[in-house]
């Protein structure tokens, strides 16, 4: 059951091999086994999930009795899934990992959550995030720190780290997340699963932290977030149907594109141009490790063997990615980070850093440092220059990629780092974040395990609204390299 894709699991439910109640109960049991080790769950919805599963099981009985047709059952019928805590789930807290919002409970479902529920899936729980969703590790004063299912001493990533850990452990068929700087792709890569960040503005943000759906109606294009809602999954077969389910405009988000048509997956790669970048040279970032570089090259060779046209991309094309990502996110007109962190109050930085030493601070170390860095002068001096460079890179890449080109490169310069190690390399996330600045679709793809049993991975990016290319390569890479490898439950 746990090795199946969500679409195959739903098919087996329809065929009567499993009941929705049985599937939900098995996944709850697995969460209860894994969560004491990985601490991925924010809020459980097990009782509600059991009720939904009972209703689905009764519906399945009607199918057996011929009272309804198989075609009337939605695509993810009876399949359990999980949701990043920053997405609204009716009746659940949506705190963003902020101590000041620890009592916030929402009375709505985010649009993507509602669409997946309407597609037949059953939510089991919400999952852990960093403070305000702003760090590579999922750790906050409310829920604590999430661990990697392949090595508890390592991070599961952020900001959708709870999703990475639960999906990676096999306790969730798929999970909904969000991505502003690699936030679905890094957890997926660290935890050995797939993730897709769709093209910017192809999926409505309605219900994502901190706004309500109604508040999103008043957002202008100048203040619209670079955040894109996406998903993580154990199997590549689920990526295309998930995107087809959540994409498209709703009644709240004024910026979601109305004319995005998700094209079918391709199976012939002879016309695909692959630009690989195994060793990106980015200022303020580490170089890719030897095993990460080799993994990218292995993927490129695999596609070359399938007939794709492969060539190397300039290793310095993203050299200023840190400044570019910073300028792109700053141009969205958000409130200062310190104001969001304190919920409009003031922060006594000296006191809070002292309290951190005895683990009694209201904030995390990354949150306090980010708020302080924002106060430094001249950080915006190269703002316009960086935005101009972003436009130049976009122009160069779109001329190369067209409608049949992809980029293959690392998600992150190493496998999942040990806890707190990202403090020493805080900007490495821009290996992924550059595609948020560009607005391109990007997919994290697992590539097996290294000699220490840790997941290896790559990401594939394409031009705007060419998501199907990324998803097609994910399916092909899974065939070539095996995809998700189930971890063992730690003792």
Where are the model-predicted features located?
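Glycine/Thr-rich phosphate-binding loops of Rossmann-like dinucleotide-binding domains
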Residues: 134, 184-185, 213, 284-285, ...
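Short low-complexity, flexible loop/linker segments enriched in glycine and/or proline
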Residues: 138-142, 189-193, 322-330, 424-425, ...
């Amino acid at each position: 059951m746990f090795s199946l894709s969500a679409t195959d699991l739903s098919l087996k439910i329809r065929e009567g091999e499993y009941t929705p109640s049985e599937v939900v109960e098995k996944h709850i049991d697995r969460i209860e086994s894994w969560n004491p080790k990985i601490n991925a769950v924010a809020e459980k919805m097990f009782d509600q999930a059991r009720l939904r599963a009972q209703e689905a099981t009764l519906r399945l009985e009607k199918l057996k009795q011929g009272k309804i047709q198989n075609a009337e059952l939605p695509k993810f019928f009876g399949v359990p899934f999980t949701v990043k805590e920053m997405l609204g789930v009716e009746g659940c807290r949506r705190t963003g990992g902020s101590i000041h919002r620890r009592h916030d409970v929402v009375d709505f479902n985010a649009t993507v959550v509602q669409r997946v529920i309407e597609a037949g899936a059953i939510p089991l729980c919400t999952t852990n995030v960093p403070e305000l969703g702003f760090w590579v590790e999922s750790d906050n004063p409310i829920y604590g720190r999430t661990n990697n299912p392949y090595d508890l001493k390592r991070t599961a990533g952020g900001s959708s780290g709870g999703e990475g850990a639960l999906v990676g452990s096999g306790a969730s068929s798929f999970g909904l997340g969000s991505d502003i700087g690699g936030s679905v792709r890094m957890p997926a890569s660290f935890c050995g699963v797939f993730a897709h960040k769709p093209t910017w503005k192809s999926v409505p943000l309605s219900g994502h932290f901190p706004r309500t759906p109604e508040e999103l109606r008043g957002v202008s294009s100048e203040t619209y977030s670079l955040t894109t809602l996406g998903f993580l999954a154990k199997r590549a077969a689920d990526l295309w149907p998930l995107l087809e389910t959540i994409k498209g405009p709703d009644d709240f988000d004024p910026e979601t594109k109305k004319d995005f048509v998700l094209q079918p997956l391709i199976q012939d790669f002879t016309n695909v141009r692959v630009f690989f970048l195994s060793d990106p040279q980015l200022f303020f970032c580490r170089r890719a490790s030897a095993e990460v570089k080799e993994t990218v090259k292995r993927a490129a060779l695999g596609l070359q063997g399938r007939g794709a046209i492969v060539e190397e991309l300039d290793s310095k094309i993203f050299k200023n990615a840190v400044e570019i990502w910073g300028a792109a996110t700053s141009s969205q007109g958000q409130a200062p980070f310190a104001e969001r962190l304190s919920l409009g109050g003031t922060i006594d930085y000296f006191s809070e850093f002292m309290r951190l030493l005895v683990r009694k601070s209201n904030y995390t170390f990354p949150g306090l440092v980010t708020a302080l860095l924002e106060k430094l002068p001249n950080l915006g001096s190269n703002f316009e220059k960086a935005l101009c460079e972003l436009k130049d890179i976009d122009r160069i890449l779109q001329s190369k990629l067209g409608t049949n080109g992809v980029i293959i490169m690392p998600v992150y310069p190493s496998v999942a780092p040990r806890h707190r190690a990202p403090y020493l390399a805080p900007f490495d996330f821009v290996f992924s974040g550059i595609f948020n600045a560009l607005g391109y679709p990007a997919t994290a793809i697992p590539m097996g395990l290294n000699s220490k049993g840790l997941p290896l991975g790559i990401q594939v990016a394409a031009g705007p609204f060419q998501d199907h290319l990324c998803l097609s390569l994910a399916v092909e890479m899974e065939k070539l390299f095996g995809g998700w490898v189930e971890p063992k439950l730690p003792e």
